[in-house]
Amino acid sequence: MSNLDYKQFTERHRPHIQPPDSIIFVTYRLAGSIPRATVREYKARRVWLEDQGTHIKNKLRRNKSPEAKRWLEQVEKFKREWFVKFEEIMHSANTGPMWMKDQRVADIVAAGLQKLDGDAYRLDAYSVMSNHVHAVFKPFLSGNDLIEGLKEGRPIFTSEHPGLSRIMHSLKGSSARECNLVLSRVGQFWEHESFDHVIREGKFYRTIRYVLNNPVKAGLVNQWGEWRWNYCRIELIDKL
């Protein structure tokens, strides 16, 4: 079986399931592409937010209290602010790894995204840049796909489709091995953490345009279609 075949999950590791029909915008980057001091600041603030969430866990489950609502708003604001900050750093970077400048490496990363199209997700768009990748896709896994059972007295969940964390593990793992081989290097290739969020209603085409225009914004091409490592699902092109 491939690493995306039939899966088993314990209760503790039950996959995070997005709302039905959710479309995900994800950004993942090379290890070391953001200065360590910036990463430390980000992680410290994230831990603080997580601690606040632990204190109001029961309220968050009900999602009704003003305190829980304020915390969720803080989380969304935090994610937006740091996404923008990381983007600015990566686009203006003149130091740090830029392995995808090597066409062989960029081709491997793009091929990995294409490989899971129709298997783990419906791929809508991606852009492979020198030190990071943007992708938009719709995972096939939903809450209705999970089958609950027992194994050695413990609850488990099985599904034919991988969750988001498993998708990212597959994308990063296989491409990291191939890219390191091409580059004759060893060590961590991708940063472990990725940015991801569900695209809100009415923001889909705006997000697609943002992804595809990354190389245009960086001054690498004049039109997004000129960038070899851009992809857009053909049904969407006329609507951009």
Which ranges hold each PLM region?
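Short catalytic/metal-binding and nucleic-acid-binding patches
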Residues: 1-240
